[in-house]
């Protein structure tokens, strides 16, 4: 990687470190997502403890954190491998944010945003997988884990030059969901629409 690419990856990390869930909850007067619900600062938990508008705002912002640096990297002349590492940097920032004691979200929305400029076919396959599993199961976490397991194969098929960095991103996503995997195994994971059934 070039020196510029390393600094640009650092920029992507810093951008990823801006936790939209925490900031939007503060602005909207909602509880701290790190201390309520699933204790995860992400769109799903904001939906759980707050409302749809706030959750949608978090989702869009988190996707843009991954999409903007990778998209801009194309126009800055970064190589394909460097673009993949920039995507990794944005996801690392979201998962381990320097501005919030390195305790961040799961990284799914940021990973989707980062992968979209790399390959719309991969992003579409990832989104389709997530939606299918979610509609069948109702579990956001299970949808994310299965998507993360399959995305490296999608990348290998459509854009093989990005397989290594994207596989690293997917390993991060699976690692970040280890608590969810245990709850799924024990049958203790909440379905997303459980909140609306209680109303």
From Swiss-Prot:
InterPro entries: G3P_acylTferase_PlsY. The chain crosses the membrane at residues 4-24, 56-76, 80-100, 115-135, 154-176. It is a multi-pass membrane protein. Its EC number is 2.3.1.275. One of its GO terms (cellular component) is plasma membrane. One of its GO terms (biological process) is phospholipid biosynthetic process. SMART domains: G3P_acyltransf. Its main location: membrane. It catalyses: an acyl phosphate + sn-glycerol 3-phosphate = a 1-acyl-sn-glycero-3-phosphate + phosphate. It is found in: Cell inner membrane. It is an enzyme of class 2 (transferase). It comes from the Bacteria. Catalyzes the transfer of an acyl group from acyl-phosphate (acyl-PO(4)) to glycerol-3-phosphate (G3P) to form lysophosphatidic acid (LPA). This enzyme utilizes acyl-phosphate as fatty acyl donor, but not acyl-CoA or acyl-ACP. Probably interacts with PlsX. Belongs to the PlsY family. NCBIfam families: glycerol-3-phosphate 1-O-acyltransferase PlsY. This is Glycerol-3-phosphate acyltransferase. It comes from Haemophilus influenzae (strain PittEE).
């Amino acid at each position: 990687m070039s020196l510029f690419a390393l600094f640009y990856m650092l920029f992507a990390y810093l951008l990823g470190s801006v936790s939209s869930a925490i900031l939007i909850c503060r602005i909207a007067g909602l509880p701290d997502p790190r201390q309520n619900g699933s204790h995860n600062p992400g769109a799903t938990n904001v939906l759980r403890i707050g409302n749809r508008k706030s959750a949608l705002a978090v989702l869009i912002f988190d996707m843009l954190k991954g999409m903007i640096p990778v998209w801009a990297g194309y126009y800055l002349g970064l190589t394909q491998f460097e673009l993949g590492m920039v995507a990794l940097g944005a996801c690392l920032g979201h998962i381990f944010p320097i501005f919030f004691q390195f305790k961040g979200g799961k990284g799914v929305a940021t990973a989707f945003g980062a992968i979209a400029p790399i390959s719309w076919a991969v992003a579409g396959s990832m989104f389709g997988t997530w939606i299918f599993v979610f509609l069948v199961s109702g579990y956001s976490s299970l949808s994310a884990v299965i998507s993360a397991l399959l995305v490296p194969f999608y990348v290998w098929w459509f854009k093989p030059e990005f397989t290594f960095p994207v596989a690293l991103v997917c390993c991060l996503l699976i690692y970040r969901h280890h608590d969810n995997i245990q709850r799924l195994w024990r049958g203790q994971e909440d379905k997303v629409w459980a909140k609306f059934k209680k109303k």
